[in-house]
Amino acid sequence: MSAWDVWTLSYLFGFQIYFDFSAYSHIALGTARLLGIRFPENFNYPYAATDPKDFWKRWHISLSSWIRDYLYLPLIGAKVISRSEGGLGNQVVEKRRSNENKGLFLSWGIMGLWHGANWNFLIWGLYHAAVIYGYRKFKERSKRVAINDKIACAMTMPIMMLGWIPFRAESVDHTMNMWLLIVTPASYLDTLGLRENAYLVGLLLVLGFFAALRLKKPLFSVVKSEIRPIAQAIGVLFFACLLVLV
């Protein structure tokens, strides 16, 4: 296995878990709307995020906001004066700076173990804690540096994709070996191990990028304005065909 294989597989799994998870979340949202119930969005184009913190504001919003409100904020001694629907919109009026880092790593460690009681999930949680901590320090030391959103997105996506390795790997050794390949220059000299299916893999990656990034309009707006009228027309034609057959 080469570094190219690791990158390819991490991107493919990152797209797979996003499409799988967000798909049945949207199925639940759509089913609820048929019954006149509106649930908050659980995914908001996470791979369009411009930094790690922004990613977790967009990914599995119900869980990440719950962890933030009921675990992270209490751990850092934050006082919250209001909560909006879904745990979003907290107003923090006081917090202890010294507790932020401890709360960050502890809450992410717990979040990792919540996904599964093994070392790989703990590593997954601590990886994201370290990434968020590193980004926080970067912002503190480069407040005057302005980065274009597209460039920031291009820098954020590979960092988040590498975080899926411990989530999917079979063991800690497997995780460490794959990460080691990423930082080993010689491993980039090897060819892609998936070269027999290179065209298919390339097509899947391109489709994944286009499907994962932000649309100009929110998904439900597209469905309502463009797909819904077509669906209604098809429904009328289908009913007319039934009448003719009867």
PLM feature spans:
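Membrane-embedded transmembrane alpha-helical bundles that form the catalytic cores
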Residues: M1-F209, K217-V246
